[in-house]
């Protein structure tokens, strides 16, 4: 039986000392969105629950204001 290496959970926001995630910081928000426009879950990114809530709220506000698109796959 092959055991897969499991990556250690790592919260980038805790490590960098970021207190609040800003909806105007597009470069950070784009790292947590898939190419389909979905928000990447915290079990994949390793983000703590407190920051995942702030992140999803910031992404939704940025989408509403038109800073980031709802989806990148317009055909």
From Swiss-Prot:
UniProt KW Electron transport keyword: no
Superkingdom as given in the UniProt entry: Bacteria
Record key words, sorted: Ribonucleoprotein, Ribosomal protein, RNA-binding, rRNA-binding
GO MF terms, alphabetically ordered: small ribosomal subunit rRNA binding; structural constituent of ribosome
SUPFAM superfamilies per the UniProt record, alphabetical: Ribosomal protein S18
Matches recorded under Gene3D superfamilies: Ribosomal protein S18 (4.10.640.10)
Annotated GO CC locations: cytosolic small ribosomal subunit
Keyword NAD: no
GO biological process: translation
Family, per entry: Belongs to the bacterial ribosomal protein bS18 family.
Function description: Binds as a heterodimer with protein bS6 to the central domain of the 16S rRNA, where it helps stabilize the platform of the 30S subunit.
Name the record gives this protein: Small ribosomal subunit protein bS18
Species assigned in the record: Buchnera aphidicola subsp. Cinara cedri (strain Cc)
